[in-house]
Amino acid sequence: MSASRLPGKPLLKINGISIIQHVYDKAKATNLGKVYVATEDVEIQTEIEKNGGNSIMTSKNHQTGTDRIFEAVEKIKDIENIKYVINLQGDEPQISTEDILNLDKNVRKLNSKIGTLCTDIKDKKIFSNKNIVKVSVNETFRKNNYSPALTFFRNTEEFDEKFTYHLYLSLIHI
């Protein structure tokens, strides 16, 4: 909510529905399990809960989204049987349910502990944008649509365009 680039972004409306609600609805539509929004903001909690969704309040002191998810899982695990977590970015309303389901399928098929969904970077400006996390993969990824990530990075000094992707979401088995 307090992002410097676009304050309040999760609550901005697209076709009368907040961005965060669009993402929540996409997650729910997968029917993979219970969906929670982990947030530090009462406004986001209110938005999700007024539409019948589940939210978990977390600390404002987290350095990363992974830290926030860890806290949320710690709070939820005593009341829910959590096998894995799919971490969706709350500001990616165009994520497709098909992509979420494909990530789930591939992580299960490969018996992985973690998986990350990414996409080709088509806009050259994204390469130099330090606000966008990118991942470097290898030729195996190009052939099979999965491979170990070589590295995650924000800086762009040393990368090969051919093997660089923008991150969308990750799935973590617990």
Residue locations for each model-derived region?
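Anionic-ligand binding region
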Residues: 120-170
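Conserved small/polar residues in nucleotide/adenosyl-binding loops
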Residues: 172-174
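Short, high-confidence coil segments that cap the C-terminus of an alpha-helix
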Residues: 32, 80-82, 110-113
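N-terminal glycine-rich phosphate-binding loop and ensuing alpha1 helix
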Residues: 1-39
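Active-site donor-binding loop signature of nucleotide-sugar glycosyltransferases
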Residues: 16, 58-60, 90, 137, ...
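Short phosphate-binding loop-to-helix
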Residues: 36, 42-88, 92-105
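Conserved donor-nucleotide/metal-binding helix-loop-beta segment in metal-dependent transferases, i.e.
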Residues: 97-126
